[in-house]
Amino acid sequence: MNTTLITGASSGIGEVFARKLAARGRNVLLVARSEEKLVTLCNELGRSNSIRAQYVALDLSKPEAPAQLFAEATKRGLTVDMLINNAGFGSMDDFSKLDLARELNMIDLNIKSLVELTHRFLQPMIARKQGAIINVASTAAFQPVPYMATYAATKAFVLSFSEALWEENRAYGIKVLALCPGVTDTNFFEAARGHKPPARVSQTPEEVVDTALRGLAQGKSHIISGWTNFLMTQSERLAPRSLITRVAGRMMRSQQKDSK
């Protein structure tokens, strides 16, 4: 059974991916930690769209979790022809003040889990010569971000990794896309440190997902969601990195002050 696997699917961008793809008639396998939210969402999607919506409640930051997820999808007889690696989180403060265990946990989820899931599900796609992978990066991938140092570094990895795989797998008929949203109206900032996103530059998750699906259909290696975000990332490539880093630091300090 052809299925789209979506991680971080219980809310935000992941939930919107699930809703929009189910509306297109795609079966979905949703993954997140909250079983209660997954059950509710799967029941709703199945009733509303006449598709098969399944879930696996799992903490993908755990070392054994990606292998467990692959084994479970195989056990259920699912053909995962689209993988959306959306699970991830960030933190916001001076790096020296942040909890080290949480920073390392972020690396496990944002990078290690994403790499393992991509590797495991990519191999069957290559054998079938068909498939698609969307890895959710960020506009933070394009420059250092003081006060979100680890998070931005993980997203820089995701962008570089995804673009390399885009080239490696074109000959197999497999699409790989790095989705780079900017500030989005989700609970990301609250989870990072109780901050609210600045509304003046926020996009909705629906806008971000529409951008991703358009970019995937066009065969792009990466896509930046939002015209303002696109212009910002282009200017960052032209200016000296030291200047960009200082400007980013000022913006983050202002964001921390305004959202307290």
Residues of each region from the PLM?
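The beta1-alpha1 cofactor-binding region of Rossmann-like NAD(H)/NADP(H)-dependent oxidoreductases
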Residues: E35-E36, V56-Q68, L100
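Residue(s) in the substrate-gating loop at a strand-loop-helix junction
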Residues: S138
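Conserved glycine-rich cofactor-binding loop
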Residues: S10-S11
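Substrate-binding pocket helix/loop in short-chain dehydrogenase/reductase
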Residues: D94-S96, R102-I107
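Conserved glycine-rich Rossmann-like NAD(P)H-binding loop of the short-chain dehydrogenase/reductase
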Residues: R24-L41
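SDR active-site lid
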Residues: W166-L231, S242
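Active-site helix of classical SDR
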Residues: T118, T154
